């Protein structure tokens, strides 16, 4: 079968020291996971100038690409996707893993249309041997290093999918809740065809509405 291959040059690793730790931590997380709704990790090969990471290939692309054609109008399809996302998330949390950057970019579809969570670059393992990273490699809208919440802690996640607990710095003991909020935002986007908080023009306005004004994204009229 086909495999997806990520290629990383050693030059990139040496110029960005955090990247090596980030990749190492992500591989540790992915090695733990085996579930129909999680992209499967096959292994890594280290060559002279490059590192190759092998993962399950998802022919259907991302949920983002699907939503470029508009909302998911068929309610049965939406229900199936929502149940698959919930199954995948329930499994992650049962393994003590919090994804921390759930959004349509990080949800893929295989050739059968089965939902798969991907990109564990921001994931955290809730255990004594905690591993965490600061950013998702593929997230252009991910907060830049240095962004902080109301408690002065580093923020992780993409603002429009970010839970109130994250903005207010109240995630201690409620880590799973942030993924559930983000997943709710994704399902809402599938139903509406527009991103949560799409009417706001910048990330700080979004975070104010989520954390300070205690507002939720608008629900569909129908």
Task: Give residue spans per PLM region.
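A short, aromatic-enriched beta-strand patch in the conserved N-lobe beta-sheet
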Residues: 43-44
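Glycine-rich ATP phosphate-binding loop
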Residues: 1-12
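Activation segment signature within eukaryotic-like protein kinase domains
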Residues: 81-82
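Conserved short submotifs of the Hanks-type protein kinase catalytic core
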Residues: 49-62, 66
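Conserved end of the kinase activation segment
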Residues: 147, 166-177
């Amino acid at each position: 079968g086909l495999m997806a291959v990520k290629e990383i040059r050693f030059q990139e690793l040496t110029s960005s020291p955090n990247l090596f730790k980030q990749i190492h931590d992500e591989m540790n997380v992915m090695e733990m996971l085996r579930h129909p709704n999680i992209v499967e990790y096959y292994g890594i090969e280290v060559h002279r100038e490059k590192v190759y990471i092998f993962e399950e290939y998802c022919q259907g692309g991302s949920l983002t690409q699907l939503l470029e054609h508009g909302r998911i109008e068929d309610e049965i399809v939406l229900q199936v996707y929502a149940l698959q996302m919930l199954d995948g998330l329930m499994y992650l949390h049962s393994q003590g893993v919090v994804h921390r950057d759930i959004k349509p970019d990080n949800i893929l579809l295989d050739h059968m249309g089965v939902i798969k969570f991907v990109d564990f670059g921001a994931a955290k393992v809730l255990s004594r041997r905690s591993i965490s990273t600061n950013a998702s490699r593929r997230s252009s809208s991910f907060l830049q290093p240095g962004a902080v919440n109301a408690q002065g802690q580093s923020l992780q996640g993409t603002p429009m999918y970010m839970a109130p607990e994250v903005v207010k710095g109240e995630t201690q003991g409620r880590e799973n809740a942030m993924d559930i909020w983000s997943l709710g935002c994704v399902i809402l986007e599938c139903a509406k065809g527009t991103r949560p908080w799409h009417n706001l023009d910048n990330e700080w306005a979004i975070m104010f509405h989520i954390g300070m004004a205690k507002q939720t994204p608008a629900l569909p009229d129908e």
